[in-house]
Amino acid sequence: MNGNEPHGGVLINRCDPACHFEGCACQAELDQLALSDLELIAIGGYSPLTGFLGEKDYHSVVKEMRLANGLPWSLPITLPVGEKTARQLSAGDHVKLVKDGVTYGMITVTDIYQPDKTQEALSVFKTNDPAHPGVKKLLARPDYYIGGPITVSSLPDKSFEQFYATPAETRAAFQKLGWKTIVGFQTRNPVHRAHEYIQKTALETVDGLLLHPLVGETKSDDIPSDIRMESYQALLNHYYPKDRVMLSVFPAAMRYAGPREAIFHALVRKNYGCTHFIVGRDHAGVGSYYGTYDAQNIFQSFTEEELGIKPLFFEHSFYCRKCGNMGTSKTCPHSPRDHIHLSGTKVRELLRQGKKPPKEFSRPEVAAVLIKGLHQQPVAIKQNSGELQ
């Protein structure tokens, strides 16, 4: 395993502000998922991808979790278009990529194909239940895919620009800080004591932590990213060593693909310069579609050498009254009745009532931010199950 090397050996950069669009045959309207994928391809987050998957790579990823050349890649990164657009295109055509009247770049078409969405859903999400948010999104998108390399002339407006960094920029920051080993942590939820315990346990063995919250498209009942970002800052300011942690946003959308998304999240953090990646229980899960530790077990499908990043597996952590500290079933011998564990639903109920969860569960500074933020939300938002992600 060559630490810190991008996936595939080269950090991709598909940004070209001088890109011209005069020769484009037509344009394709992007949805929010495609726009975030376009951005991450362009800045190298999805290295070695230089564009949206062609048909051969698509089928290989769906069936084998590998690109056609054998390199591990667990999620199909595709660009859907409607039948009318698909039928007027040919290989070699240039297509403008737009959203809401803004042109972001273009794709040079190599492939035009119609996927079997039922098979894609069953392979990627382990279900074709339309109630699953990832399946619902898949089925709602247009029925044809176009593949080929992309060129991006301008990136989307940056959310939380102060905390935005490309893979090249995080790598440069790690080098400047002198970090040789970096553990990445993916989250779409607030960080409570259980997450803090796991992060700090990992931090004992590496040089630095990249706290990399996802701020792209999520379910409507996930906590809004602006509230989460404020809660992360409150936590880091009070409880983490400032020279050992970097907070940076991850502009991807959630797919809720559970085990496959855990592999994907690890590979992407490898591109950002991480050497290690934390995988907790039900990583990127939703509802009861995946087993508690499926997202850890899937790593057995690959060697650590071919992934190029070391997964760190953690069991569910909790505060034990008898131990007087945080722990897991590996370190605590006591009964579950001695453990403080609140469901996400219960935590949200307390926060909405203006009540702080027990200090053993959530830092008071974090709870205060969440209470304030949720009371300012015009629409009630339910907390998803209290999984670590």
From Swiss-Prot:
The keyword Nucleotidyltransferase applies. The keyword ATP-binding applies. One of its GO terms (molecular function) is ATP binding. Keywords: ATP-binding, Nucleotide-binding, Nucleotidyltransferase, Transferase. Gene3D superfamilies: HUPs, Sulfate adenylyltransferase. SUPFAM superfamilies: Nucleotidylyl transferase, PUA domain-like. Pathway: Sulfur metabolism; hydrogen sulfide biosynthesis; sulfite from sulfate: step 1/3. GO terms for biological process: hydrogen sulfide biosynthetic process; sulfate assimilation. Its EC number is 2.7.7.4. Belongs to the sulfate adenylyltransferase family. It catalyses: sulfate + ATP + H(+) = adenosine 5'-phosphosulfate + diphosphate. This is Probable sulfate adenylyltransferase. Pfam families: ATP-sulfurylase, PUA_2. InterPro entries: ATP-Sase_PUA-like_dom, PUA-like_sf, Rossmann-like_a/b/a_fold, SO4_adenylyltransferase_pro, Sulfurylase_cat_dom, Sulphate_adenylyltransferase. PANTHER family: PTHR43509, SULFATE ADENYLYLTRANSFERASE. The lineage of its organism: Bacteria, Bacillati, Bacillota, Bacilli, Bacillales.
